[in-house]
């Protein structure tokens, strides 16, 4: 992968298959802090490089590498995500940029 400015937000789809219900709940609660729930075990997120790394690190600490699976699909620059998404059925709403309170 090429070098990416860490402050440039990208749109991600994060999908996971977690074998243990307790770990699944921990992953779900973590993901609520990083993105918008789309459907069972699927979130959409707008993340800069630092938040992507932080999210991946937390998820890595929660999952069992032998039985669980987390996919982070980079859809590209967040401002252009509408061009890359096709939705069937219920309308897909892209995640708008929101102010972050630190």
Curated annotation (Swiss-Prot):
Mg(2+) binds at residue 17. GO terms for biological process: defense response to virus; maintenance of CRISPR repeat elements. Keywords: Antiviral defense, Endonuclease, Hydrolase, Magnesium, Metal-binding, Nuclease. Pfam families: CRISPR_Cas2. GO terms for molecular function: metal ion binding; RNA endonuclease activity. InterPro entries: CRISPR_associated_Cas2 (IPR021127), Virulence_VapD/CRISPR_Cas2 (IPR019199). Its EC number is 3.1.-.-. Its cofactor is Mg(2+). SUPFAM superfamilies: TTP0101/SSO1404-like. It comes from the Bacteria. Disulfide bonds: none annotated. Homodimer, forms a heterotetramer with a Cas1 homodimer. Belongs to the CRISPR-associated endoribonuclease Cas2 protein family. CRISPR (clustered regularly interspaced short palindromic repeat), is an adaptive immune system that provides protection against mobile genetic elements (viruses, transposable elements and conjugative plasmids). CRISPR clusters contain sequences complementary to antecedent mobile elements and target invading nucleic acids. CRISPR clusters are transcribed and processed into CRISPR RNA (crRNA). Functions as a ssRNA-specific endoribonuclease. Involved in the integration of spacer DNA into the CRISPR cassette. This is CRISPR-associated endoribonuclease Cas2 1. The lineage of its organism: Bacteria, Pseudomonadati, Pseudomonadota, Alphaproteobacteria, Rhodospirillales.
